[in-house]
């Protein structure tokens, strides 16, 4: 169960990071809305409050994030899981909190993660991720992860930092998507389920070079519902936050897992992360 949980957290974070790091121009066709594109008859005040179409919002967000050099993201993930294996059943709650400081080029990431699973001691992990190494601290011990174990993960992280047409994937669910506004933010809302969300996740993960294990996990999923909410600042057109709620089930090796999950991510410190310095004890662990 823990392996499945960890894999799925990474899948969701890859999508979330890609949305904040996108640097290409997309041409997604917006769904039908009541927001006409013509300004005829509108007063200046009306024009100022007009909600952009999906295409306009994606284009402006791409332009803004292309110039962004660094940012911080924080995520909180709550999962309620039920595992059935024959006549045995197990319920488990998992709470994960994650904070990442990210410099895009050259890629440098510092992250702190805490995972709490019911009935187990909380696990705290600190990591520094560069373009070719991962230094990890569990407890008081720093270790340099062997290159053979990190190469694929680093390539996936690089792809998420500079995706090719990442938001273009939302065309696959445009009939389930609408643009609204809340306070200082524009909001992209998507309510999807079944094959639509599975195809969206597959397309994004294939583009980010996800491994065979992640693809196999997606093939086994039956997602009954998934709601996504992307908040984009009206003034800067930079991502502000994302909310994801999902109910899904999957089977593997005769075991059936049902999961109810809520994930909230926030983005801040745009262009304010100036330096990430790896501590000497972490560097010494690679010697």
PLM segments and residue spans:
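Positively charged n-region of N-terminal signal peptides that target proteins for export
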Residues: 1-5
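Sec-dependent N-terminal signal peptides
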Residues: 7-12
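C-terminal motif of bacterial Sec signal peptides marking the signal peptidase cleavage site
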Residues: 16-19
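Subset-of-secretome marker
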Residues: 21-287
